[in-house]
Every structure is written in C-alpha cells, then in structure tokens.
C-alpha cells in the first residue's frame, strides 16, 4: 500500500534535489534537475512533470497518449535507466571519484527502488536519507507482462486523470474487477490526528500513485499489526519486535479479514527457535505450517468467532490471496491464474472451430454406437436361427427314438407267441399212447 509518508518523502527529495541542482549551477540542468533518468534509481518515484521533461524530447504531451503508449514509454525509460546504471557501475568500479554531480556515491547501494541520496549535508542528514531510501524500496516492479483492460486501453491519460479527480482521489483504483480502492480511508484511520494533505495536481502525482489509482496495478497492503490484549499486563517485554513480525503467524478473533487489527490468540516463529532482542521476548508457539489467507472466516455455530491465518512474507491483496501464493499455485498445478491479475483467458482457437470439432466428435460417437447396435442385433438373429435348427433336430430324433421303441416291443411279443404254441400236441400224443397199452398179456 502506498502510504502518505512515502508520498511526502518523495516530494521532499524532489525539492531537495532541485535546490541542490540550483546550488551547483550545472550547465543545461538549471531549468530542471531531472533531465537524465540515470540520476534516479527508480523512475516510479518521479512526478509526471519530471518524467515529462526527462523523456518527451519531441514535445508530445502525456495527456494525448493512450494508456498503452504511456506504459510503453515508461518501460522504455526504465530499460534506459537500468542500462545507464549498469554502465555507471562498470565505469565506477575502475575509478570512483570522491564527489560526482553533488551525489554521495557511498549511498548508491541503498536499494533498487530507493531515490538517490544527496551529499553536502551532515551525517544525520545522510542517515535520514538512507532511511527514506529504504522506505522507497516498495516501488513498482516492471509490469512487462501486464495486459490493460479493454476500456482502459482506449482512454487517454487526461481522461483517466479526470476520472481520478472526480472520484475524490480514488478514481478507478482497486483491482481489475472494478472494486474501488479504500486506501485513503485506511490511511486517514491509521494516521489519526494527522491533518489531511491537499490533493496533488496532475503534475505533482508520482508515476506509482497514478498507476495504482488508475487501476493498472494493485496496491500492496502493509503488514497487519495486532493490538495487545487489554486484559494482559502492559509489559514492554510482551511487545513483538518489528523484525519478528515478518515471520508472525497469528489467529485473530472477531473478523474474517486478517488485516483487521484484532486480538492475537497465539504468535510464533515458523522455525521453532526463540528470538529475543533487548532483554525482552514473547511466548513461542509450536511450529505452524505456513497457511494461506482466504479472507473468509470459520464460524462455530450461530455465535461462533471467525478466524483467519496469515502466512509469512506474503502481502495479502483485496481478494484474500497473496501475490506470491497465486504465482506458486499457478506454477505448481499449471493453472492459468491470469484472471486474478486482469488478463483474459486465452481461448483455444476460434469459436466456430471449437463447435465444429464438437459436432464431428458427436457424429463419430453416434456412428460408433450404431455399428455396435447392428453387430449386437446380427449376433442375436444368428443365435435365434441356430436355436430353431436345434429344436427341429431334437424333434426328429425324439420321433425316431419312439419308432425304434415301438418296433422292439412288437418283435418281443411275437417271439413270445412263437415259443408257446408247439408244446400242446406232444402232451396229447403221450397220453394216447399210454391208454392203448393192455393191462395184462394173456
């Protein structure tokens, strides 16, 4: 999230740089100190007027450019700036002068996103400049793979600025889905008694603020800082150090949003080792696996409390997913997560070809099913014909068997009759012979 302190720091650095340039009286740079982008380590900290004078040599105004042309010019300027810094670093490795163009070369390594530190001040000013350089390290990275939404591509820079101005500073800020950003309200709530700064004009706004408010990129939210429990003793040793907040796992009560400064139930370092600085410390919890914040809460019954888990070193966006976690999910599972960053999903060919392929596939499936049904029907008819033939053969065999059985019985009965008829005449002849014999021979 772009804080108000960073904005004020950028304005003070620009004013100090202009005063330093007038004091040195360099030739060709009296009208504007930022004629060369190589003197800035991050072009996103420049205002639009400074970037206009440094880049547009042909006199073309940014207001007449489309947003596509504006982003292309920013990327070209960033590449030139990086090339100049590399060349200057290569030249400075051989011979490093004590003071060059009013800049202190010892502070050039303050960070890629920071603004260069001017010399000519005391040691305290150098320390303050180093701190401001570290604060400015949250500049926008190169968005070379970013695709603008279709309505935003057709608009000019002046039209986008007018929409931002009408919206009261929020404009089209927020994510690509159209949700407006609430950074101004959060900053006012955090700063409390600070007086509201005046609304910057078009030329005074930095490139980073303009791109964020226009909706080209998202804001990176700051790390949540939970308030201490009022029921506990106000002991300074229970305060969590700032260095340990990056490795903090907290479970917050009363809200589904982990950025809400609620009550922390348990904190700890994922490595499992205690960290104590300055004689104080905090109670360690057992090692917890890095969790993913989904923005929603878990309720236990009607009156349950909502809880959320925060992972280390993963700034949570407005939709509840960290930028690094989204990239890891897309790279691990091969899923195109471009829709979360405003990019449209690439369609596999024209719609007509897709429909034609589907129709051909449906026709092939129908033909295959018809062939299968025809084969099944032919097999059934063949089985029925074989069954009828077997039935006829079975009937013929049964009839032949019955005829054979009848003939066999008939022959048996005929044989029995032929055996019983010759015995009767023999018995009669014997009886006759016995009756003719005389009883005595006289």
Swiss-Prot record:
Residues covered by region (Disordered): 1-37, 83-151, 164-201, 218-238, 414-442
Pfam family, one: bZIP_1
Chain intervals with Low complexity compositional bias: 99-109, 177-193
Domain bZIP: 355-418
Result when mutating residue 391 to R: Loss of sumoylation
GO CC, one annotated term: nucleus
Phenotype of null mutants: Exhibits abscisic acid (ABA) insensitivity.
Leucine-zipper, as annotated region: 383-404
SMART domains reported for this sequence: BRLZ (SM00338)
Biased composition (Basic and acidic residues): 1-15
GO function terms (MF aspect): DNA-binding transcription factor activity; transcription cis-regulatory region binding
Segments of skewed composition (Polar residues): 136-146
Signal peptide start and end residues: none
Annotated Gly residues bias: 110-123, 167-176
Function per UniProt: Participates in ABA-regulated gene expression during seed development and subsequent vegetative stage by acting as the major mediator of ABA repression of growth. Binds to the embryo specification element and the ABA-responsive element (ABRE) of the Dc3 gene promoter and to the ABRE of the Em1 and Em6 genes promoters. Can also trans-activate its own promoter, suggesting that it is autoregulated. Plays a role in sugar-mediated senescence.
Subunit structure: DNA-binding homodimer. DNA-binding heterodimer with AREB3/DPBF3 or EEL/DPBF4. Interacts with ABI3, KEG, the mediator subunit MED25, and the AFP proteins AFP1, AFP2, AFP3 and AFP4. Interacts with TAP46. Interacts with the 36 kDa catalytic subunit (subunit C) of PP2A. Interacts with FYPP1 and FYPP3. Interacts with FREE1 (via C-terminus).
Name of protein: Protein ABSCISIC ACID-INSENSITIVE 5
Organism per entry: Arabidopsis thaliana (Mouse-ear cress)
Gene name per UniProt: ABI5
